[in-house]
């Protein structure tokens, strides 16, 4: 089990692990006004939804500290598509040569 350091400042909660904002089982920052932020290793990050949920309902999508539009975010989480050389050639419309 992970042991976090939780700091409370004027009803705002901040979770830390080894001095970095970090929490794996929920938001690492919970503001008294309702905004929540997910952090891992001091980077905004969440793989199952927005990394920031603002109290007013707006959302921001981050992976490893990089902000994405919602569409870009979900595309980043899709597994890479595996293609054969023949499939790639079919998509490109011409032959390719694999080099190493």
Indicate where each model-derived feature is located.
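Short, low-complexity, charged amphipathic interaction modules
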Residues: 79-100
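Glycine/tyrosine- and acidic-biased, solvent-exposed loop/turn segments at the edges of beta-strands
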Residues: 1-80
């Amino acid at each position: 089990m992970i042991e976090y350091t939780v700091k409370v400042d004027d009803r705002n909660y901040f979770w830390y692990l080894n001095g970095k904002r970090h929490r794996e089982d929920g938001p690492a920052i919970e503001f008294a006004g309702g905004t929540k932020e997910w952090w891992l290793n001091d980077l905004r990050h969440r793989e199952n939804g927005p990394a920031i949920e603002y109290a007013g309902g707006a959302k921001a999508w981050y992976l490893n500290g990089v902000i994405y539009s919602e569409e870009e975010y979900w595309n980043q989480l899709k597994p890479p598509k595996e293609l054969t050389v023949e499939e790639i050639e079919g998509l490109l419309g011409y032959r390719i040569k694999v080099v190493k």
